[in-house]
Each structure stands twice: as structure tokens, then as C-alpha cells.
């Protein structure tokens, strides 16, 4: 499902500390041998996430672009996605054979969504550490993303979160939309997310 503008564009959103950069790293490493992959990261005042991905050796540095959004990070992925679209256009010129571009948003609240002009598929990441009630609080990221990732499941016993409750609430809030529990530190759940992208993205 490459878009009219080139590669499949996958938006990765979620609150600060939920594990967006860790997910982006794992997806790059899982897919880079089979696909031509690039990343655009969004930070308010720095390019910290882009620099982190380079340090993690997720991809070569020419395939990672960091944009500084200023102000509210959700504006750059929703109301005015120009800065991200320009970054993707630059990657397309530099790497004409791109198959997939991951767009990692700046950390934001549960109301953040990607403009359909920017992302073909959206993944929303939440953390077990934010509390077991997060799935039932709803918001566009929880209810309307193409895939919900409930990360840091390994920490549930330490923060008093019941994964069965989170599973039940996510099922209810998302109706038929898929979700997956993950532990990015160990790579648990990554293969399911890659399979989802291959199937839904037509890769």
C-alpha cells in the first residue's frame, strides 16, 4: 500500500515514555534486511530521538531525519504536517527505492492523531506503567489507531497493573481493531507488529 507520494508511511504516536523510540528501533532492525526503510522523528526543541536511533544503529544516519516541531508536537502531525512531508520528500529524493518511512511523533496526550495526508497506517503506543485504566480512558489514539501497542507488559507486577483488565478494556474500546501487548526491551511483540504492517501495508 505505498501511497501516491512513494513509500508506505507509518505514524507512531503515544505519550512521553511509552516506548515509541524503542518500538521504532526494533521495527527498523526487524525490517531493514527485507525493505528499504527510513525514519522521521519529531521533537519539540531537539533532534534527540533521531540521534538516539543513530546511536542504537537502527539504520544508517542518512536514513534518519529529526525535525524540531516547536510548540505543540501534535500540530506537526495533524493540523500542519508540512515539516514532516518535506522531510519525507527529502528522503525520497535521497533514497528513491524507499519502501517504508516511520514517522515518530513527539510525546503527546491521548488526543494526538496523524493527518491522513501524512500517515497511511497509525500505531499508538501506551505503557502499562501509565496505569491499567489507560485503555478505557479512550481518546483517538486508543480507539482509532490502526494498531494499539500496550508496551512494558513486563513491568505490570511492579506497578500494580492487571493485564487481563487492560486486555478486556482495550477489546471493548477498540471494537474490532487490533492491539498487541509488548515488551520492547526484550523484543516481545515485535514480530506481530511487523506481520501487521506487512499485511495491512501490502509490503
Curated annotation (Swiss-Prot):
SUPFAM superfamilies: P-loop containing nucleoside triphosphate hydrolases (SSF52540)
Keywords: Chaperone, Cytoplasm, GTP-binding, Nickel insertion, Nucleotide-binding
GO terms under cellular component: cytoplasm
Cross-referenced Gene3D superfamilies: P-loop containing nucleotide triphosphate hydrolases
Subcellular location(s) of the protein: Cytoplasm
Pfam families: cobW
Residues that hold GTP according to the record: 14-21
GO function term, MF aspect, one: GTP binding
Example GO biological process: urea catabolic process
Role description: Facilitates the functional incorporation of the urease nickel metallocenter. This process requires GTP hydrolysis, probably effectuated by UreG.
HAMAP family: UreG
Record text on subunit structure and interactions: Homodimer. UreD, UreF and UreG form a complex that acts as a GTP-hydrolysis-dependent molecular chaperone, activating the urease apoprotein by helping to assemble the nickel containing metallocenter of UreC. The UreE protein probably delivers the nickel.
Family, similarity comment: Belongs to the SIMIBI class G3E GTPase family. UreG subfamily.
Protein name in UniProt: Urease accessory protein UreG
Source species of the chain: Rhizobium johnstonii (strain DSM 114642 / LMG 32736 / 3841) (Rhizobium leguminosarum bv. viciae)
Amino acid at each position: 500500500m505505498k501511497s501516491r507520494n512513494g513509500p508506505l508511511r507509518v505514524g507512531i504516536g503515544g505519550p512521553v515514555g511509552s516506548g515509541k523510540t524503542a518500538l521504532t528501533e526494533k521495527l527498523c532492525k526487524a525490517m531493514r534486511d527485507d525493505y528499504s526503510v527510513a525514519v522521521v522523528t519529531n521533537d519539540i526543541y531537539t533532534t534527540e530521538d533521531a540521534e538516539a536511533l543513530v546511536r542504537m544503529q537502527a539504520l544508517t544516519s542518512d536514513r534518519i531525519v529529526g525535525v524540531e516541531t516547536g510548540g505543540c508536537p501534535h500540530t506537526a502531525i495533524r493540523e500542519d504536517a508540512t515539516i514532516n512531508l518535506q522531510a519525507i520528500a527529502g528522503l525520497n529524493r535521497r533514497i528513491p527505492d524507499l519502501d517504508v518511512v516511520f514517522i515518530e511523533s513527539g510525546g503527546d496526550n491521548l488526543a494526538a492523531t496523524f493527518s491522513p495526508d501524512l500517515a497511511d497506517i497509525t500505531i499508538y503506543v501506551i505503557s502499562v506503567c501509565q496505569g491499567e485504566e489507560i485503555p478505557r480512558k479512550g481518546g483517538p489514539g486508543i480507539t482509532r489507531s490502526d494498531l494499539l501497542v500496550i508496551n512494558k507488559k513486563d513491568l505490570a507486577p511492579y506497578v500494580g497493573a492487571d493485564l487481563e483488565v487492560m486486555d478486556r478494556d482495550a477489546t471493548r474500546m477498540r471494537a474490532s481493531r487490533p492491539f498487541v501487548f509488548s515488551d520492547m526491551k526484550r523484543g516481545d511483540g515485535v514480530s506481530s507488529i511487523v506481520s501487521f504492517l506487512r499485511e495491512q501495508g501490502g509490503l
